[in-house]
Swiss-Prot record:
It comes from the Bacteria. It comes from Buchnera aphidicola subsp. Schizaphis graminum (strain Sg). It is found in: Cytoplasm. This is Phosphoserine aminotransferase. Homodimer.
């Protein structure tokens, strides 16, 4: 079988070593005679898996004991509702940094529970789109929290400077950003992330929340979205997606073996630079995003002639390069190169892009 590289935006590629281990253990995990999918989430065996996953994540991101780690369900969209239901307190107003598709989705959902201020930070200059720095955000004085999304997977744009507004609670949708680079957790009140991009398979959502922010859920909050209840029951108030939890734990161990987040960050920079260098040296491929806001995780580009799009995708697939079609919202191409994508995969795509341009440019 020829080698296939999967550039899907999510569910996304999982490290091959992790898949091999899961395959090896699938029918007889830890020599107990059955799959980990078949054992109770309250068994001592699975509780050990959960504890190790939490500790490995703490080690990777340097998360102090002043933060709770919750393993939940419902994805990022579930958190679009859960965040205001848990963090509003006596406030009615919130600040939502609108940088693209997903941050706008969070804003729309929040309108059901609070009065979100739409703070648009996307601008254009000399034909290039860019995002305002946190110091330029028009933050309210009386908002319960500030919500933002540091990486917009559809738009291919990122905010790399971490916000720091002293006593303001910062909430981050890190679904496509978590574990890709070093961050200062202490800057945030809450971080949430769907697993299916940089963590593991879909089905589990990870929340990092400052402990002093737990316990203020509104009365309308469903129990499974109430952070206090989730915390009280150690993320097992209802039956969790045990296989997703287990596989996420394997990914955490894999990341540690790679040298941790510092090494991963360096590799991610190298991978994205390969593709952006080809785009910048070409009139065939187009990316209209300012260099300071280009996503390292999701490299978006258009062909100079959109009539070549289907041919590009067809020939790319024949070359073992899958899932490069851009989101329907903006079209074009998108190469999602999360942590699991090896450098060799990006090099193969770069080589193909040069070939395709030479043939059809």
């Amino acid at each position: 079988m020829n080698l296939i590289y999967n550039f899907s935006a999510g569910p996304a590629m999982i490290p091959k070593d992790v898949l091999y281990q899961a395959k090896k253990e699938l029918q007889n995990w830890n020599q107990i005679g059955c799959s980990i999918m078949e054992i109770s989430h309250r068994s001592k065996e699975f509780i050990q898996v959960a504890l190790e996953a939490e500790q490995d994540l703490r080690d990777l991101l340097n998360i102090s004991n002043s933060y709770e780690i919750l393993f939940c369900q419902g994805g990022a969209r579930g958190q679009f509702a859960a965040v205001p239901m848990n963090l509003l307190g006596n406030f009615k107003e919130t600040d939502y940094i609108n940088s693209g598709y997903w941050s706008n989705c969070a804003l729309i959902e929040a309108k059901k529970y609070c009065i979100p201020k739409n703070i648009s930070v996307r601008q254009k200059k000399n034909g290039k789109s860019f995002l305002l720095k946190p110091s330029q955000w028009n933050i309210s004085d009386n908002s319960a929290y500030i919500h933002y999304c540091p990486n917009e997977t559809i738009d291919g744009m990122s905010i790399y400077e971490e916000p720091n507004f002293k006593n303001k609670i910062i909430v981050g949708d890190f679904s496509s950003f978590i574990l890709s680079r070093r961050i200062n957790i202490e800057n945030y009140g809450l971080i949430y992330a769907g697993a299916q991009k940089n963590i593991g398979p879909s089905g589990i959502t990870i929340i990092l929340i400052r402990k002093d922010l737990i316990g203020y859920a509104s009365k309308i909050s469903p129990s499974i979205f109430n952070y206090y209840i989730i915390s009280k029951y150690n993320s097992m108030f209802n039956t969790p997606p045990t296989f997703s939890w287990y596989l996420s734990g394997l990914v955490f161990k894999w990341l540690k073996k790679q040298g941790g987040i510092k090494k991963i960050e360096q590799l991610n920079q190298k991978k994205s630079n390969l593709l952006y260098q080809i785009i910048d040296n070409s009139n065939f491929y187009i990316n209209d995003i300012d260099k300071r806001n280009r996503s390292q995780m999701n490299v978006v580009f258009h062909l100079y002639n959109s009539k070549l799009d289907n041919l590009f995708l067809k020939e790319a697939k024949n070359a073992g390069l899958n899932a490069l079609k851009g989101h329907n919202v903006i079209g074009g191409m998108r190469a999602s190169i999360y942590n699991a994508m090896p450098l060799e995969g990006v090099q193969s795509l770069a080589k193909f892009m040069l070939y395709f341009e030479k043939k059809y440019g």
